[in-house]
Amino acid sequence: MAIHITGAPCCWGVDDVKNPYLPKWQTVLEEAGKAGFRAIELGPYGYLPLDIDLVSAELSKNGISIVAGTIFDDLVAAGNCENLLRQVDDICDIITKLPPLPREEGQRRRTPYLTVMDWGHDERDYAAGHSDRAPRLSDEDWGRMMEHIRAIAEKAAKWGVRAVIHPHAGGYIEFADEIDRLAEDIPDEVAGLCLDTGHLRYSGMDPVEWLRKYADRLDYIHFKDINEKVYNEVLAEHIRFFEGCGKGAMCPIGTGM
């Protein structure tokens, strides 16, 4: 089976949509097309507009398709479920109306995917990469997060979209014990996995080992690299995950660990 490399707005530093210094979304699509990418992620909720005609025209102009949408939000809080499900509908509504990528022989699920990440907890953000000191969820809170993930995946499936769970440094699904528990609690028929080589390494795991371990659950992979010198310096500080990235902990692929 062929493996295709696509892009994501995070390669342009697009993380928090409230950041006033983000590049224009049109610039990202234009530069992605010039770089030779044939597909890109939608980016964080609210970065690309939800105007299907506008986005479709810009994608077509640059020869790009959308490979995935993203939910990057608090998956734990009891009061956030309605917001999460609204995002599912908004994202799936646009990505299912855009031209799809062709399905490869042997591909487990067709694109576009809905990448789902937990985020928004200071106590875990400052403990990113530190499994020994990062607080874990109570069984009750973990169970609620799993309920939210199942609800997200089920709603996405009604749109014909496959949800894939992305363990993320600084969230409550980051470390080895949490990934294993997630894989046990959320079966493959409900949602797939999107493992990220940079986040795995940042969180103390061997990416190759974990990609092999969950090869039969993987629908999608994120490739990143880590600057070992900066990474070690960042871990020695009391610092948020994206502050560490801002210092250069994540680096161009092939130049790091």
Model region roles, listed by residue range:
Residues 1-6:
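Extreme N-terminal starter segment of soluble prokaryotic enzymes
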Residues 10-24, 76-85, 134-143, 254-255:
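Active-site mouth loops of central-metabolism enzymes
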Residues 11-13, 44-48, 72-75, 118-122, ...:
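Active-site-proximal loop/turn and secondary-structure-junction residues that shape catalytic pockets
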Residues 19-23, 123-130, 231-243:
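Short, flexible, mixed-charge acidic loops at enzyme active sites
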Residues 24-48, 98:
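Catalytic domains of carbohydrate-active enzymes, especially glycoside hydrolases
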Residues 39-40, 142-252:
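Acidic/histidine-rich catalytic cores of soluble enzymes
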Residues 48-70:
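Aromatic-lined substrate-binding rim segments of carbohydrate-active enzymes
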Residues 61, 65, 80-193:
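Active-site acidic/histidine proton-transfer and metal-coordination neighborhood
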